[in-house]
């Protein structure tokens, strides 16, 4: 019996030394905590790290994919999204459930289109939940990471070691993590304390996760404390700061204007006078009467200059429609101005539909069940129900835009 106790103590010490992981609640407290939330010492499903799931992402989805759209859930279970029913979560990163939504429609006579679900986002591999590698791209677009290696911990540090110290330094050691640093109500750490970085994302100083990519940038951002919510009455404003596009370039370097020889859309560059003026004036197609004081659109967010000042970022993160100001000329376009991080209802994980001329017709979102004789047309509905189209915009009212609204590229470019 004494020998068994010694073995058990050694195993526990080994787990703690390796930093093996945590529950979802503990993760969102800022860093590593309850190891047994993800690991099973005697009856694991994965031999490599004694994981509770067959693989890393399956282990994550055990907590982040349960029924009910709330808080940290980012995967809607299959049973909750049958044909015609959209994924339920409205987190800023999007719901991975969109990867399972394939749409087939005929935009015109003799023309059939199939829009595969795996075109809607990052195809994490989570065998226990039926998520498989990208069926088209063998490597990350604009990069060389093996698509079969993509998992939640390719981007997130499942042990949450990266932290923000009291002097603002980002490090993997130096003080204990006392809480999350992701939210607009997150307190600044006192001397001898630290808070977790945004969403436990890997960054400068982190080790590589699945896929072997090492990040050299820090993803600075702040989100409202309530963020998985409908935007029917007020937007969810995430305050994005320095490092966003450089962080994405870790895997997608050839998609970025600063690291590619191709003709690509600028990122991590100031909007400048003309684009900032367009954004602030643009309300909808044909309506350029807006002002900077009320022009913010959560479907087309921007990076707040190049700041990593969390006092500034916290003041901008909002879900009450109180902070409505649009960009200054020094604010920046970033990857997440056009894309979400996980998945969306549209191809290439864009925030709005770029595969059609109009996103709103006859004053409503189009859909196969639309009451509008125009909105029901296949070239506008594109195989989706009204509920699916609306949810892809986080329930933002169609009336927020023009009755015949063109692509939201026009929020910056005003060509309509």
Predicted regions and their residues:
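Bacterial N-terminal signal peptides that target proteins for export
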Residues: 1-11
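C-terminal segment of classical bacterial N-terminal signal peptides
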Residues: 14-24
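A motif-centric signal for short, conserved binding hotspots located
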Residues: 25-416
């Amino acid at each position: 019996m004494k020998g068994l106790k010694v073995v058990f103590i050694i195993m526990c010490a080994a787990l703690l030394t390796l930093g093996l992981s945590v529950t979802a609640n503990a993760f969102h407290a800022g860093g590593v905590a309850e190891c047994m939330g993800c690991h099973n010492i005697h009856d694991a499903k994965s031999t490599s790290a004694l994981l509770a799931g067959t693989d890393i992402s399956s282990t994550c989805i055990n907590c982040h994919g349960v029924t009910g759209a709330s808080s940290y859930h980012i995967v809607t279970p299959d049973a909750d999204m049958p044909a015609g029913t959209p994924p339920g979560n409205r987190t800023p990163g999007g719901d991975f459930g969109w990867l399972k939504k394939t749409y087939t429609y005929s935009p015109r006579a003799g023309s059939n289109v199939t829009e595969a679900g795996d075109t809607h986002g990052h195809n994490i591999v989570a065998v226990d939940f039926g998520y498989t590698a990208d069926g088209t791209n063998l490597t990350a677009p604009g990069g060389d990471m093996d698509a079969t290696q993509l998992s939640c911990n390719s981007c997130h540090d499942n042990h949450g070691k990266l932290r923000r110290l009291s002097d603002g330094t980002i490090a993997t050691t130096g003080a204990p993590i006392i809480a999350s640093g992701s939210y607009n109500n997150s307190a600044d750490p006192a001397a001898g304390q630290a808070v977790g970085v945004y969403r436990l994302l890997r960054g400068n100083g982190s080790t590589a996760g699945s896929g072997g990519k090492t990040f050299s940038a820090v993803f600075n951002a702040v989100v409202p404390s309530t963020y998985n919510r409908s935007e029917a009455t007020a937007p969810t404003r995430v305050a994005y700061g320095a490092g966003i596009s450089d962080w994405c370039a870790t895997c997608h370097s050839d998609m970025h204007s600063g690291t590619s020889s191709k003709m690509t859309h600028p990122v991590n560059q100031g909007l400048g006078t003309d684009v900032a003026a367009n954004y602030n004036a643009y309300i909808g197609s044909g309506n350029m009467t807006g002002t900077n004081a009320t022009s913010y659109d959560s479907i087309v967010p921007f990076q707040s200059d190049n700041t990593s000042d969390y006092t500034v970022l916290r003041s901008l993160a909002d879900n009450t429609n109180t902070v409505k100001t649009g960009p200054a000329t020094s604010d920046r376009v970033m990857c997440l101005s056009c894309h979400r991080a996980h998945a969306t209802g549209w191809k290439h994980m864009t925030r709005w539909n770029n595969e059609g001329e109009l996103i709103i017709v006859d004053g409503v979102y189009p859909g196969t069940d639309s009451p509008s004789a125009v909105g029901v047309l296949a070239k506008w509905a594109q195989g989706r129900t009204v509920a699916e189209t609306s949810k892809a915009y986080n329930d933002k009212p169609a009336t927020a835009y023009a009755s015949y609204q063109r692509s939201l590229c026009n929020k910056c470019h005003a060509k309509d």
